[in-house]
């Protein structure tokens, strides 16, 4: 599916993305290695079992964020985005584990003309990721 254009967005619009993605151990370990994140909660099962509140390794939260945004791309911005201006208010209220499947829904929070580029618009999204439960 191709992304939507500025004129197609309306504040309050909610898109439940059709894609879901199961997170594997390899996803988590490779992402942690590529980003040089040596946090043992992500890569050391023995440590996580003995020293974490979760009792096992958790998926790197930044991987989860990136995956959530990626899941949204085909139905939101694929081929239509000029630039991603940033993220704010990122929270990880619950851990993701190896074998969890991430599903995402996006709410359109704001749609407005750009002040610095009058021929372009700005759309603010609220992405919410959830596991299979």
Whereabouts are the PLM-identified features?
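Hot-dog-fold acyl-thioester-processing enzymes
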Residues: 1-86
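HotDog/MaoC-like acyl-thioester-processing domains
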Residues: 1-11, 92, 96-133
């Amino acid at each position: 599916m191709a992304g939507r254009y500025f004129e197609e967005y309306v504040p309050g619009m909610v898109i439940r993305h059709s894609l879901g993605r199961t997170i594997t151990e390899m996803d988590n370990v490779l992402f942690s290695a590529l980003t040089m994140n040596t946090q043992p909660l992500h890569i050391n099962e023995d440590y996580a079992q003995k020293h974490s509140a979760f009792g096992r390794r958790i998926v790197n939260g930044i991987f989860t964020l990136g995956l959530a945004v990626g899941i949204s791309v085909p139905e939101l911005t694929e081929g239509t985005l000029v630039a991603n201006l940033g993220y704010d208010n990122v929270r990880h209220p619950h851990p993701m584990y190896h074998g969890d499947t991430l599903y995402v829904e996006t709410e359109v929070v704001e749609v407005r003309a750009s002040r610095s580029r009058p021929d372009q618009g700005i759309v603010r999204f609220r992405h919410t990721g959830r596991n299979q439960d």
